[in-house]
């Protein structure tokens, strides 16, 4: 089974994955194959209160419209979201292989669309 692994420690919130996916699937306004979710802002950890440093976290979440770009991956290409990720924090492959990349040092999310 294949999936997409996202190291959201490094996601910059650029929305490139959303745009590439939306264009490929031809989805109307308000529908997504991958949706960027923002959490924050909150004060930066370890800073004195009121110093003005804030942190955001961005997490791309695959939706039920995602088919892992089956037509592309069958030809050996990457899913559009992975190919267009500007931060290079998205990976496509076998779930077992992707799970081995998760080192416990950063924040990871492993998505397996269609898995039950």
Q: Where would I find each of the regions flagged by the language model?
A:
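Non-ligating segments of multi-cofactor redox enzymes
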Residues: 1-116
